[in-house]
Curated annotation (Swiss-Prot):
The lineage of its organism: Bacteria, Pseudomonadati, Spirochaetota, Spirochaetia, Spirochaetales. This is Ribonuclease HII. GO terms for molecular function: manganese ion binding; RNA binding; RNA-DNA hybrid ribonuclease activity. Keywords: Cytoplasm, Endonuclease, Hydrolase, Manganese, Metal-binding, Nuclease. InterPro entries: RNase_HII, RNase_HII/HIII, RNase_HII/HIII_dom, RNaseH-like_sf, RNaseH_sf. One of its GO terms (biological process) is DNA replication, removal of RNA primer. PROSITE patterns: RNASE_H_2. It catalyses: Endonucleolytic cleavage to 5'-phosphomonoester. It is an enzyme of class 3 (hydrolase). One of its GO terms (cellular component) is cytoplasm. It comes from Treponema denticola (strain ATCC 35405 / DSM 14222 / CIP 103919 / JCM 8153 / KCTC 15104).
Length: 198
């Protein structure tokens, strides 16, 4: 059994970093999966809905806030989000096995990237560069992490409309930097991230 883990939102100047953990059944339509960066926003949403609608897909989302990013740095906050995502998936997997009278087996984990988070309760864990382009479970995780974070940033735009989060999702675009310059930092700004010419 394989669990894929990936993150979204390491680079933005605002908002949380998000991670997803996913286990896919053999019956899943793998042909719809790609690295989230290679899909349009509309297509990512379509795939997200397909994943959510499949009762045999086990998934969970984890978050680390901008405050946690500022306190422990973006790499450690990314690991924290991944650990939280896996903890959620682990509980769902236990419940899934119990409901289906299946034997519970701790999954093997593949994490996209170079670094391995401190995840317990797994059979094995390894990091694989570009796993989001080669491992279906990680592709699915990249899509869920990206869409979850995008939806969160859209919700933040309702609270802080002057920053335009619904458009740039917190990334350091010219419009975002201009909004920070004019309005000051919002409560979801990452204070530890250096912004040139601010």
């Amino acid at each position: 059994m394989l669990c894929g883990i990936d993150e979204a939102g390491r680079g933005p100047l605002a908002g949380p970093v998000t991670a997803a953990a996913v286990i896919l059944p053999s019956s899943f339509d793998f042909s719809i999966l790609k690295d989230s960066k290679k899909l349009t926003e509309k297509k990512r949403e379509e795939v997200r809905k397909t994943i959510y609608a499949d009762p045999n897909v086990i998934w969970a989302i984890g978050w680390a806030s901008n405050y946690e990013i500022d306190e422990i740095n973006i790499l450690q906050a990314t690991f924290l989000a991944m650990e939280r995502a896996y903890e959620g998936l682990y509980l769902k997997l236990q419940e899934f096995c119990k409901l289906n009278n299946d034997k519970f087996i701790e999954p093997d984990i593949i994490v996209d990237g170079n670094f391995i988070p401190n995840i317990k309760n797994c059979s094995s864990i390894k990091a694989l560069v570009k796993a989001d382009d080669s491992v279906y479970e990680v592709m699915a995780a990249s899509i869920l992490a990206k869409t979850a974070r995008d939806r969160m940033m859209i919700r933040y735009s309702w609270i802080y409309p002057e920053y335009g989060y619904e458009k740039h999702k917190g990334y350091g675009t010219k419009k975002h930097i201009e909004a920070i310059r004019f309005n000051g930092y919002s409560p979801i700004q990452r204070r530890s991230f250096f912004v040139k010419n601010l």
